[in-house]
């Protein structure tokens, strides 16, 4: 059940649970669950090993794209001190689109706001919903499987959803970005030659 919920909005998770149960959830269930999650994240969330160095090493335009609420994303970036590594990057959340991931709308919005064609965007995602969304938007996707909440079957699920490569540890991000950039250069050279 956790692997199915990964990357979904709280409201969508609760809808799914309601379909599996005979119990009626209270009207404020989503808000109560979000508040409990955010309180726990504030106490327990830590940065993924190597993520600060990996992000800091990339001299490329960046954005944060999440199905979480904006307040949760901002708090998580502050708690993990990733806001320092990322700098002043745009943040896109499910609140900004009618249909959250796995719909590609949020990734299309991010590409548009960055002024970058989706085909020239590289995404790092840990959820099937996120990989599905980014892939459907026409982006190249790295499936990250180095977080503590990831199970052993997640790499296969991410590849099936459209991930281009699997990243087990953030120390490998720079090499995958370099490989992707070489691929883009090859495409550019082919287009110029034609």
Segments predicted by a language model, with ranges:
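Active-site neighborhood of HAD-like aspartate-dependent phosphohydrolases
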Residues: 1-3
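Helix-loop "lid/cap" segments that line or gate small-molecule binding pockets
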Residues: 9-24, 76, 111, 147
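Metal-dependent phosphoesterase signature
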Residues: 15-53
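Asp-based, Mg2+/Mn2+-dependent phosphohydrolase catalytic module
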Residues: 52-56, 60, 69-194
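Hydrophobic alpha-helical core bundles mediating ligand binding, dimerization, or RNAP-core interactions
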Residues: 6, 10, 14, 30-38, ...
């Amino acid at each position: 059940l956790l692997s199915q919920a990964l990357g979904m909005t709280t409201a969508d998770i609760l809808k799914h649970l309601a379909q599996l149960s005979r119990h009626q959830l209270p009207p404020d269930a989503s808000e109560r669950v979000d508040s409990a999650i955010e309180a726990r994240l504030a106490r327990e969330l830590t940065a993924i090993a190597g993520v600060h160095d990996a992000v800091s090493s990339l001299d490329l335009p960046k954005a944060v794209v999440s199905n979480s609420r904006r307040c949760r994303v901002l708090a998580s970036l502050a708690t993990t001190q990733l806001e320092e590594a990322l700098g002043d990057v745009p943040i896109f959340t499910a609140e900004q689109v009618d249909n959250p991931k796995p719909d590609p709308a949020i990734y299309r919005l991010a590409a548009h706001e960055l002024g970058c064609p989706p085909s020239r965007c590289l995404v790092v995602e840990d959820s099937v919903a996120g990989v599905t969304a980014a892939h459907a938007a026409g982006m190249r996707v790295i499936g990250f499987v180095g977080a503590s909440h990831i199970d052993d079957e997640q790499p296969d699920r991410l590849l099936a959803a459209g991930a281009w490569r699997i990243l087990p540890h953030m120390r490998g991000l720079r090499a995958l970005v370099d490989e992707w950039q070489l691929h883009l250069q090859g495409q550019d050279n082919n287009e110029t030659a034609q």
